[in-house]
Amino acid sequence: FSEPDQYTVPKKYQKATKIGNAMTPDMEKISTLKPDLILSPNSLESDLSSKYKKIKISSSFLNLKNLSGMYKSIEELGKLFNKEKQAKILIDEYVNYMTSFREKYQNNVSPRVLILMGLPGGSYVVATESSYVGDLVRLAGGTNIYGDGEGKDFINVSVEDMLKQNPDIILRTSHAMPKQVMEYFQQEFSNNQTWQQFDAVKNNKVYDLNNEYFGMSANFNYQKGLETLEGILYENN
């Protein structure tokens, strides 16, 4: 398995052979293990597909860009591995949870949200509805000020343009190295006076999110993520 940056590996897999991280797995190790199939997120398909073909091992790339994609992948894996009953249990749980969650806030005003994804090294991009964190905000009832980014998960936007959009709420999360990234955000918001002009900053509506729940790929922590957003988007309700 590929080594996770921050998640705990289930006990039954802790003795499995480590092959590096998901973005740059050790192809030589994979080749010696001779798996029947390799599963990877589709965000890495352009980087890994040719490498898997080179070592002549079949691969499948799962859509983890949003929750609906993740559960579609679960349905497909259930069929592939003859685990359709188990897959259906997970899918039904998701559908029931989302139905109940939406009913609570269907009549509420949707706050306008800016999502910043911090990157190691001191920079950031804007997350759109096409990203996983953007999908969570959409499902929670928030309106992304940059919409779906015309299909792009992340976009580069000037602070001045963000100010023109004047979001009600600013959310900040990290791609990796959260401690370093959040320190960068604190410096950026303190040193760049343009941020002080945002209503969200003036009204103390800037929130730092845990990237265990608000990272790059959909995962089973989505309920915790939505419940976190529930407290942020509807704190006065």
Locations of the language-model features?
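His/Asp/Glu-enriched short active-site or ligand-binding loop at hydrolase and phosphoryl-transfer sites
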Residues: 130-153, 172, 208
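Basic- and aromatic-lined ligand-binding clefts that recognize polyanionic substrates
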Residues: 86-141
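A short, structured surface patch at a secondary-structure boundary
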Residues: 1-33, 37-43, 145
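Structured C-terminal subdomain patch of bacterial secreted/periplasmic proteins
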Residues: 71-74, 79, 88, 92, ...
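Short helices/loops that flank or line small-molecule/ion binding pockets
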Residues: 27-34, 54-55, 157-166
